[in-house]
Amino acid sequence: MPGAGTDTPIKRIIVEKDGAIGRIKMDNQSRRNAMTLGMWQDLGKAIEDFANDDSIRVVILSGEGGKSFCAGADISEFEKNRSSEDSVRIYNEAVEWSSDQLRTIEKPTIAKIDGFCVGGGFGIATCCDMRICTDDSIFAIPAAKLGLGYRVDGLKPPCE
């Protein structure tokens, strides 16, 4: 697992098994379920565990609280976890690893979207096989409005 052994914040990924259904919930409600480094690492690990569990037939990802699926990266931790070349590399490896786990799992994946699905949350949703959303869900890529570029590998899933 990329970034293993690093100092990470409290992890906020809820993993549940309900019969043949694997559930992964992003739970950082005070930040609209924005992803911390620890959450990215736990997301990849949860998907890897479900991939290796023969009793799981489908994986459903959702946001806790009913107001946001995921608001992307938790920018409040950028100073700590993205302030040096090494920390940026560790962060990017965690995002890429968890996204790869999600894209390549050989079980159907469903993004259950309710509320905000922006930035990295949009990326997570596009890595899933299916996306189901409420009528009031909001999709956006805010970095584009700020003139920030995306890594090419981060643009691949939405374009496929």
Per-range role (PLM):
Residues M39-D42, Y91-A94, I124:
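Hydrophobic alpha-helical membrane-association signature
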Residues R31, G63-Q101, G147:
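Glycine- (often His-adjacent) and acidic-residue-rich active-site loop
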Residues I24, L61, D74, I124-A125:
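Hydrophobic/aromatic residues within transmembrane alpha-helices
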Residues S98-T104, K112, V118-E160:
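CoA-thioester-processing core
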Residues M1-S62:
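Conserved CoA-thioester-binding segment of acyl-CoA-metabolizing enzymes
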Residues D53, I105-E106:
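Acidic-histidine catalytic/liganding microenvironments
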Residues N33, G72, G115, G121:
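Conserved phosphate-binding and hydrolysis motifs of nucleotide-dependent enzymes
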